A protein has these predicted regions:
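General structural concept
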Residues: 40, 52-54, 66-67, 73
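Beta-rich accessory regions
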Residues: 1-22, 28-32, 201-203, 208, ...
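Hydrophobic residues embedded in beta-strands of well-ordered beta-sheets
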Residues: 37, 49-51, 86, 96, ...
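Hydrophobic core segments of beta-strands in well-ordered, beta-rich domains
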Residues: 26-44, 78-93, 119-121, 126-148, ...
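Beta-propeller blade signature
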Residues: 53-56, 98-102, 152-160, 206-216, ...
Length: 407
């Protein structure tokens, strides 16, 4: 059987893996091992879900392609990292099964014997799941469709693969889903669980992120739930774990009027506690020095949440070595100033605005959502070069992203 075509195009710090434009393609997961990038995906072939493996060297060439196994279309397949080792976890016929990645061998145990026997009168309709590992305990976060066709989020816990899972948290319906969900993935670090997933409405994809704070005693608290997608047709956002537990996020961008699908991969990756990453590996700003001339420097951290009122004058400043940049709201206008020089002004009217600032070294990106119009621009602090992108899309009308409080 012919394997999905794949080629790599490099552009500065970003590699684009180009695949066939097939709506059935799903990214299962990936990881870096040395200079070899491993990518796993499925596509529907002859009414079967087929798992493929790809390896690329230095993000420049494909060095291996393989078909691993065929599954039923309804089966859910995930790649998980448990204590540095990678496994495939398959949900089929209401049971979980586990395979080692290399070599591709089925392990002789079931993760969960039968979810329907855990106090539920009927079989659970699992839409998607992800598994993470904290302090010798396995946690399964499941998206389950209830009788009202709403998606509920439940967390199961188990000390061992073989032991019975028990529900430790049921968040109920979070009104997360429009038409469908997929690409649920998770990442745990320093007491925070990052969960990323896609939803789809009227053929528009929107990636969303949930952040949980974890405390001993299996206590989970939602810190943030917000949209992540910048483009209406963006899909398959997922976590990739790189060297030294670094983390970045990648997505398939299914371009309209194109025969190709693009998988965007940041090649320079970094991670710091409490900072949420966005392509290409930019970080939420943590060098804010003043808000409306009030000194927050001693209180503000990367976990802080800033709430602004677009109808009132607003000024945000941060330092960068020998210069100062200010972000201003005044008379329903948004402006960026550097060293007392205005470099950008946008009319915000009176719409509700969500503002986020992402930083990667000297590159700053700022996004504003006003009604159905989303404006994103980035520039280099050293030369003031910046790009502006305006996306008219109802799907991101309620776009919100930001850092979060750590009480």
């Amino acid at each position: 059987m012919e394997i999905t075509n794949i080629e790599i195009k490099n552009n500065k710090n970003i590699a684009h893996i180009v695949l066939d434009n097939d709506e059935t393609i799903q990214i299962i997961g990936s990881f870096l091992y040395g200079n070899v990038y491993h990518l796993f995906l499925t596509k529907i072939v002859n009414d079967k879900k087929v798992l493929f493996s790809y390896k690329t060297k230095d993000f420049t060439e494909v060095i291996e392609r393989a078909e691993l196994k065929k599954y039923e279309k309804s089966d859910i397949i995930k790649l998980i990292n448990l204590s540095g080792l990678y496994y495939f976890v398959i949900f089929s016929n209401n049971k979980f099964f586990c395979y080692s990645v290399e070599p591709f061998i089925e392990l002789n145990f079931e993760l969960i014997d039968n979810l329907s026997s855990k106090g539920h009168e009927t079989n659970l309709h699992v839409k998607d799941f992800t598994i993470f590992y904290i302090n010798d305990t396995f946690y399964a976060l499941l998206f389950i469709e209830n009788e009202q066709n709403e998606i509920e989020t439940q967390i199961f816990a188990s000390k061992e693969f073989k032991s019975e899972y028990k529900i430790i948290k049921n968040f109920g319906s979070l009104h997360l889903v429009d038409d469908t969900v997929n690409s649920l993935s998770s990442y745990y670090k320093d007491g925070l669980v990052y969960v990323l997933f896609d939803s789809k409405k009227h053929k528009n994809y929107s990636s969303k992120v949930m952040i949980f704070k974890y405390d001993e005693g299996t206590k989970f608290e939602i810190l943030m739930l917000s949209s992540y997608s910048f483009l209406s047709n963006e899909r398959n956002a997922f976590f990739i774990q790189g060297k030294q537990n670094n983390l970045f996020i990648s997505s398939i961008l299914s371009k309209e009027n194109s025969s190709k699908t693009f998988l965007t991969l940041p090649k320079i990756i970094s991670y710091e506690k409490g900072k949420f990453l966005k392509k290409p590996a930019k970080l939420i700003l943590n060098r804010i020095i003043s808000v409306n001339d009030f000194d927050f420097s001693s209180k503000l951290s990367s976990h802080s949440l800033l709430k602004i009122d677009a109808d009132k004058p607003f000024k945000l400043s941060f330092n960068n070595t020998d210069s100062t940049m200010k972000i201003l709201f005044f008379e329903q206008k948004f402006a960026v100033e550097k060293d007392k020089k205005t470099i950008l002004i946008l009319d915000t009217k009176k719409a509700v605005i969500s503002l986020f600032i992402l930083l990667d070294e000297d590159i700053v990106e700022i996004g504003i959502n006003k009604g159905e119009e989303f404006v994103s621009f980035c520039f280099n602090q050293s030369n003031l070069d910046f790009d502006v992108e305006i996306v008219n899309d109802k799907a991101i009308k309620n776009f919100q992203i930001g850092s979060f409080k750590n009480e």
